[in-house]
């Protein structure tokens, strides 16, 4: 964060944030349980024009029209449905004439991570820091737990920690079924940690969804290559 410290909140806090946004604005309509499934596109002129979306509501498609449509799906689904070109997985070196990269695209994306928070619930609880090699953070601190000395750790004594959790592969992060499989796989990997924390007097707040690092990459007006980065080229 701006003060070089770590700040995070319990997963359920998003509900308070959403409520705060709705309360602050006079013209917001929130449609829960109505996932976007398609883009409404007009093909007039020399390019497609997105005029809204289709959502699934009560088992039926409902059209929502808008002068401006923003793809905030996180997966690039709406842009793809509107006909935008996109990439998925690692590119081959020859795709963009890069000097570094794979000879052939392997179609793989970065792995997914299931994060969680542990919180002390017993007065005699002792955090089992010895079982964690990396990936544990105190709130409002600069150092990882594993970087702290025993004295520093006991002095901070926050009693609540953010865990990077388990990392797993997902063969296709655009497919909700396969993402759910990865979610279950990550939960299984975390069971020993959950059990150890529970024995030590801690409860766990697991993230509502597995963290996806990479999905569709929508092609923009310019494709930034690895050589651009190496040469420190700036595009405005």
Where do the language-model regions lie?
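Conserved N-terminal/central alpha/beta ligand/cofactor-binding core
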Residues: 1-38, 110-116
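Flavin (FAD/FMN)-binding glycine-rich loop and adjacent Rossmann-like elements that form
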Residues: 32-33, 45-52, 56-68, 72-234
């Amino acid at each position: 964060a701006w003060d070089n410290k770590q700040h995070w909140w319990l997963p359920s806090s998003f509900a308070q944030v959403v409520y705060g946004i709705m309360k602050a604005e006079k013209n917001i309509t929130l449609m829960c349980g109505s996932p976007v499934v398609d883009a409404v596109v007009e093909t007039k002129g020399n390019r497609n024009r997105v005029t809204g979306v289709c959502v699934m509501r009560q088992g039926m498609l409902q059209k929502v029209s808008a002068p401006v449509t923003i793809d905030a799906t996180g997966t690039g689904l709406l842009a793809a449905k509107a006909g935008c070109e996109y990439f998925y997985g690692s590119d081959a070196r020859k795709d963009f004439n890069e000097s570094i990269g794979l000879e052939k695209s392997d179609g793989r994306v970065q792995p997914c991570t299931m994060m969680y928070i542990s919180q002390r619930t017993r007065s005699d609880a002792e955090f089992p820091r010895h079982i964690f090699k990396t990936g544990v953070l105190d709130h409002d601190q600069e150092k990882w737990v594993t970087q702290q000395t025993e004295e520093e750790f006991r002095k901070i004594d926050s009693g609540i920690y953010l865990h990077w959790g388990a990392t797993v592969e997902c063969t296709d992060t655009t497919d909700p079924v396969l993402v759910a499989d990865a979610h279950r796989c990550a939960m299984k990997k975390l069971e020993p940690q959950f059990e150890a924390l529970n024995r030590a007097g801690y409860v766990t707040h697991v993230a509502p969804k597995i963290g996806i690092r990479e999905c569709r990459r929508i092609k923009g007006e310019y494709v930034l290559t690895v050589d651009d980065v190496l040469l420190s080229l700036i595009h405005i």
